[in-house]
């Protein structure tokens, strides 16, 4: 793989982590000694007009030189790229890498002035819990809509029971098993919705005012948040801003009284036999109409709004995951998406000065991540989908493959890296590092099933999850090897009574990798530099001011002999995987392999 000049948004290359408008930042570029050029310039935009400024060499070794330039942030978002010119040829260095032709500015590096992020986020690993399936503290009487299931029965996938099978997991059950989460090493919990509803997933909220009594109600919530706080575990909630359930008190009032303010919260349309617009044309999920200022006030703008209430010290959330974020405020000729997104961010910042706002958007809209809205996204399209396709054994997964109505294609390592680079290049570095990375969730097949039950490939998945920039999220039960062929099937329970069914070797590896993610400086705040990409392997560096890590991820048997001496590195310590020393990485294995080493 050709090595050329490198720059990214991490601390090695940008002098200020959270600069303010009008400040100067120093940009640095690392250039290998073998790379030849006559002049290096930075092109940046000032009030929409491009300007050029020459870089100066600041240091040089046998292996590389460093070049730098100061840049004043005159606009809220500053886009820039570097030009390396020589006789009759040139190359641009943008967030997409090196190119020898002109390209659009949407792949420029970006710095967002006066943007803030939670102080605790960078060193966090989250554990996703689907409340009905994690742990049950006691038996409860079920409502009429629910179909009771025994704890260790498998979900009936895609059937008339979809959404109404109830296993009885609750918040006291979570509290009683916080030891498991803490021992795993996770310091954050992301809950799918906890509000009253008429489904097991609770994305059809009947109220945003209290916790579902089936989960133990507000009292169980307070017990859980207090216990989690004592352990240093933060909790992120899940909110539907695009729709509510047909039993939501706002919707019931709107139906019963045409003069009610709530009437304007929804779209009424006689083209549907039920008389209103539902999300995906589902009558169970009335879509919210953000033309209503009163809806905005109740949901996020008002002092006692839903968003603000649950972020208060009393209710204890440290952030929100926003469901179907790309659709909220958008309906035919209406497009209030940006207003809603910015309003939610303003409400979050006003009510909690250190909270995380992450959006579900399977199609990844880059403009949503410009510092005014979401801190990050659930990185489905820029991480999960290309990586899962690369790792997949083409098993027949239900419902297509994460938005693609086809079986998983076969791609090589270069296609994988090109895919994830396309998406990371379209957003600021700090939006990437504040995004949630995941190898599965409650809406996807389990990763263990994607790789046909192969433990070594599963381990490659968790190793990449813990070493790629972003905030890792582990779907409950992944750590013990749970499987599932679809989103519904993946929502399996954890058998707490019979641990002989757990993959204990995998669990220990999870713990080791989570610990590395939370303690190694280069994984917390380092940049990303690709060294070698093959059909079946990825080799890359994560580098901070204090540490350099080498990471190997393979999906199959590999034979690799890679010389580090040309870059001036040698092995210092093996942190995970096969032991290495000297200046050559030598790996010859008959299965998928992972390795993490510190270099000096």
Tell me the role of every PLM-derived stretch.
Residues 1-127:
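Glycan-association/targeting regions that enable binding to alpha-glucans and other polysaccharides
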Residues 16, 26-28, 531-567:
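Carbohydrate-binding surface patches
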Residues 31-33, 78, 125, 581-600:
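C-terminal beta-strand-rich structural cap/linker in extracellular carbohydrate-active enzymes
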Residues 40, 225-234, 242-264, 272, ...:
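Active-site-proximal helices and loops of the catalytic beta/alpha 8
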Residues 125-127, 189-191, 235-237, 320, ...:
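Hydrophobic faces of well-ordered beta-strands that scaffold small-molecule active sites
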Residues 126, 130-187, 194-315, 340, ...:
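Substrate-binding/active-site clefts of carbohydrate-active enzymes
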Residues 132, 370-372, 376-381, 433-455, ...:
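Aromatic/acidic polysaccharide-binding cleft in carbohydrate-active enzymes
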Residues 304-331, 437-441:
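Active-site groove signature of glycoside hydrolases
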């Amino acid at each position: 793989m050709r090595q050329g000049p490198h720059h990214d948004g991490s601390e090695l290359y940008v002098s200020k982590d959270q600069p303010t408008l009008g400040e100067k930042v120093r940009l640095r570029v690392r250039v290998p000694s073998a790379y030849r050029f006559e002049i290096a310039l930075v092109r940046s935009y000032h009030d929409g007009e491009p300007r050029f400024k020459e870089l100066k060499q600041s240091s040089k070794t046998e292996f590389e030189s460093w070049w730098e330039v100061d840049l004043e942030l005159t606009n809220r978002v500053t886009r820039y790229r570097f030009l390396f010119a020589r006789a009759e040829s040139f190359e641009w260095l943008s967030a997409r890498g090196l190119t020898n032709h002109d390209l659009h500015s949407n792949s420029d590096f970006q710095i967002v002035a006066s943007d803030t992020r939670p102080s605790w986020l960078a060193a966090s690993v989250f554990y996703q819990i689907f409340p009905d399936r994690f742990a049950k503290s006691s038996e409860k009487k079920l409502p009429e809509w629910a179909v009771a299931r025994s704890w260790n029965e498998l979900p009936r996938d895609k059937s008339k029971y979809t959404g109404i099978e109830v296993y009885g997991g609750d918040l006291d059950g979570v509290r009683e098993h916080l030891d498991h989460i803490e021992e795993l090493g996770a310091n954050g919990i992301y809950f799918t919705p906890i509000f009253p509803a008429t489904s097991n997933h609770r994305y059809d909220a009947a109220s945003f005012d209290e916790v579902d009594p089936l989960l133990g109600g507000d009292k169980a919530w307070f017990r859980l948040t207090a216990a989690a706080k004592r352990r240093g575990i933060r909790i992120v909630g899940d909110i539907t801003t695009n729709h509510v359930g047909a039993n939501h008190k706002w919707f019931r009032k709107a139906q019963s009284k045409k003069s009610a303010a709530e009437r304007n919260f929804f779209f009424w349309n006689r083209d549907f036999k039920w008389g209103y617009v539902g999300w995906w044309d589902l009558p169970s999920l009335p879509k919210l109409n953000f033309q209503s200022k009163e809806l905005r006030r109740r949901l996020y703008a008002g002092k006692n709004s839903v968003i603000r209430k649950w972020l208060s010290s009393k209710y204890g959330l440290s952030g929100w995951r926003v469901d179907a974020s790309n659709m909220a405020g958008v309906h035919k000729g209406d497009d209030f998406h940006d207003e809603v997104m910015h309003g939610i961010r303003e409400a979050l910042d006003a009510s909690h000065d250190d909270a995380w706002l992450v959006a579900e958007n399977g199609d990844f809209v880059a403009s949503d991540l410009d510092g005014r809205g979401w801190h990050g996204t659930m990185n489905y399209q820029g991480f999960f989908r290309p990586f899962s396709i690369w790792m997949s054994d083409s098993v027949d997964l239900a419902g297509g493959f994460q938005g693609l109505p086809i079986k998983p294609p076969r791609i090589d390592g270069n296609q994988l890296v090109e895919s994830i680079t396309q998406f990371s290049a379209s957003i600021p570095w700090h939006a990437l590092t504040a995004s949630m990375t995941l190898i599965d969730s409650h809406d996807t097949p389990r990763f263990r099933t994607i790789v046909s039950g192969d433990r070594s490939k599963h381990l490659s998945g968790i190793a990449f999850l813990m070493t790629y920039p972003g905030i890792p999220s582990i779907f409950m039960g992944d750590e013990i090897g749970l499987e599932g062929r679809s989103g519904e099937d993946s929502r399996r329970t954890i058998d707490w009574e019979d641990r002989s069914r757990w993959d204990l070797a995998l669990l220990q590896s999870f713990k080791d990798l989570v610990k590395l993610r939370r303690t190694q400086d280069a994984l917390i705040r380092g940049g990303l530099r690709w060294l070698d990409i093959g059909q079946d392997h990825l080799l890359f560096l994560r580098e901070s001011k204090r540490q350099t890590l080498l990471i190997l991820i393979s999906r199959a048997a590999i034979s690799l002999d890679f010389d580090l001496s040309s870059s001036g590195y040698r092995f210092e310590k093996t942190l995970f995987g096969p032991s290495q020393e000297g200046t050559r990485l030598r790996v010859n294995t008959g299965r998928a392999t992972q390795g993490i080493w510190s270099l000096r």
